[in-house]
Amino acid sequence: MLIDPRDSLLSSYDYELPEACIAQRPLEPRHAARLLMVEPEAGCRDRQVWDLLEELEPGDLLVVNDTRVLRARLQVRRAGGGLGELLVLQPQGQGQWLCLARPAKRLRPGDSIALVADGEPDLPLQVLAVEESSGGRLIQFPPECVDAASLEPLLLRYGVMPLPPYIHQQDESDNARYQTCFASKPGAVAAPTAGLHLSEELLAALTQKGIERASVTLHVGLGTFRPVETEDLSQLELHSEWVEVSEALVQAVAACRKRGGRVIAVGTTSVRSLEGVAALHGGVLQPFRGPVNLVIQPGFRFAVVQGLLTNFHLPKSSLLLLVSALIGRERLLQLYQHAITAGYRFYSYGDAMWIPPECSRQP
């Protein structure tokens, strides 16, 4: 496949988005969000997410990400009395966790801090080290907090949902609304946002029509939301995220192909999971548990995914690169301009785009 040299430059993935286009609250019901349906060759249709029911066919397989978002944003008080914030990312063993810290320069190795409850310092923690590649801090939590499941009771007491910084209001409803209906495995620090559109009613209607569903797990972290800063994308590296592909999912994909169905990814995290694991095994999907850091950008050959339901992504993000790999950078940016003009809502609580297999640029 020939690659336009501009596809390898980060600046080629920039676009101007009016602040009014950034969704601040989700729509109700979930499936009421707008859906930009991409047409083959050229053009698009403005519909709603519920209309995805008309686009999918009996025998198709929807692959969703079943990760559950942790209440991973914690307020801390420093020894000098000032407040700070931690975003809990990944376990490092023995109750030690990699966290993003703010203000980072005020949290130094050896510092004692305390989690805040009801405005007062409560549970003591220790800053152990600086993690150079992410700029994060290694924090000592209670030693029993070795994984997301054992840390979650602490987060439920002290933490809040880690909404993105472009969402300026937050309340108790986010605890349910910033989770998918199928979230089951704790570990993410951001939602797999395309899945937020799939209501229980829509999922039931899809099942009744004969559309299958299977789950993959990718615990969304730095690899998804960290800004890309490398202009030369041939040098781009992403942080690893933990992925699990089960034997049941591998069998579901194989059965879908055998019956002539289409493998449809719900969200870019599902794409990264499926393609990342396949890439580790010569293009063949196999059961897997472990870190994945695959970069998907124009020129990438998809081995598993044929169609995609996705949200509208930030300029110059790795997610924009991924979607461009499927339908082409220039066409994607044209579709984004249509969405802006037509008043679509962008980012995590925003609207969605449907890219059917016949719109893929894959050979």
Curated annotation (Swiss-Prot):
<keyword id="KW-0963">Cytoplasm</keyword>
<keyword id="KW-0671">Queuosine biosynthesis</keyword>
<dbReference type="GO" id="GO:0008616">
    <property type="term" value="P:queuosine biosynthetic process"/>
</dbReference>
<dbReference type="InterPro" id="IPR042118">
    <property type="entry name" value="QueA_dom1"/>
</dbReference>
<comment type="subunit">
    <text>Monomer.</text>
</comment>
<comment type="pathway">
    <text>tRNA modification; tRNA-queuosine biosynthesis.</text>
</comment>
<dbReference type="InterPro" id="IPR036100">
    <property type="entry name" value="QueA_sf"/>
</dbReference>
<comment type="function">
    <text>Transfers and isomerizes the ribose moiety from AdoMet to the 7-aminomethyl group of 7-deazaguanine (preQ1-tRNA) to give epoxyqueuosine (oQ-tRNA).</text>
</comment>
<dbReference type="GO" id="GO:0002099">
    <property type="term" value="P:tRNA wobble guanine modification"/>
</dbReference>
<comment type="similarity">
    <text>Belongs to the QueA family.</text>
</comment>
<keyword id="KW-0808">Transferase</keyword>
<dbReference type="Pfam" id="PF02547">
    <property type="entry name" value="Queuosine_synth"/>
</dbReference>
<protein>
    <recommendedName>
        <fullName>S-adenosylmethionine:tRNA ribosyltransferase-isomerase</fullName>
        <ecNumber>2.4.99.17</ecNumber>
    </recommendedName>
</protein>
<dbReference type="InterPro" id="IPR003699">
    <property type="entry name" value="QueA"/>
</dbReference>
<dbReference type="InterPro" id="IPR042119">
    <property type="entry name" value="QueA_dom2"/>
</dbReference>
<dbReference type="GO" id="GO:0051075">
    <property type="term" value="F:S-adenosylmethionine:tRNA ribosyltransferase-isomerase activity"/>
</dbReference>
<dbReference type="GO" id="GO:0005737">
    <property type="term" value="C:cytoplasm"/>
</dbReference>
<keyword id="KW-0949">S-adenosyl-L-methionine</keyword>
